[in-house]
């Protein structure tokens, strides 16, 4: 059946193949298989509502693996904190987490913005080798920009 959704997924699959982007290829392939076996009505709402949180959890686990393996410990932390690069990274991590917090709310509540952010993320992943954490950070940056615009237009 050639619905708009199926055609869009096939287009994204083609983009993923041309761009040789495994993440996008896997994601689109996964969604196509779910639709093909008829589980989309049950699984898509769950994935849509909880998927971002699952993704953040998986990324967090991956980042914590060096601590769990002992590759990073208190000694390495102490040595790193002597570097101004570490302090810059610490500040950037805090800023990104705070910006993304508002982005999550925006993604959940505004489908219009979500569409633009998702398309932007897909383009960045497929064409420029970006990483698909973009919607969350992008939404946070969009939220921040919207608040700044409100200040100057109110």
From Swiss-Prot:
Location of this chain's protein in the cell: Cell membrane
Topological category with respect to the lipid bilayer: Multi-pass membrane protein
Pfam families xrefs: DUF441 (PF04284)
Main localization, broad class: membrane
Listed GO CC annotations: plasma membrane
Keyword Cell membrane: yes
Record keywords, A-Z: Cell membrane, Membrane, Transmembrane, Transmembrane helix
Transmembrane segments: 14-34, 54-74, 87-107, 117-137
Superkingdom of this protein's organism: Bacteria
InterPro entries recorded: UPF0756_TM
Family membership noted in the UniProt record: Belongs to the UPF0756 family.
Name used for this protein in its record: UPF0756 membrane protein RBAM_026200
């Amino acid at each position: 059946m050639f619905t708009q959704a199926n055609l869009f997924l096939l287009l994204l699959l083609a983009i993923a193949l041309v761009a040789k982007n495994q993440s996008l290829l896997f994601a689109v392939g996964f969604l196509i298989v779910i639709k093909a076996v008829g589980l989309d009505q049950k699984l898509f709402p769950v994935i849509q509502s909880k998927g971002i949180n699952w993704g953040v959890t998986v990324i967090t686990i991956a980042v914590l693996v060096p601590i769990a393996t002992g590759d990073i410990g208190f000694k390495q932390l102490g040595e790193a904190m002597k570097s101004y690069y570490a302090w810059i990274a610490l500040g950037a991590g805090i800023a990104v987490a705070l910006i993304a917090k508002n982005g999550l709310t925006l993604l959940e509540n505004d489908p219009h913005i979500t569409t633009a952010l998702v398309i932007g993320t897909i383009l960045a992943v497929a064409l420029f080798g970006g990483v698909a954490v973009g919607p969350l950070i992008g939404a946070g940056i969009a939220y921040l920009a919207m608040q700044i615009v409100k200040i100057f237009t109110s």
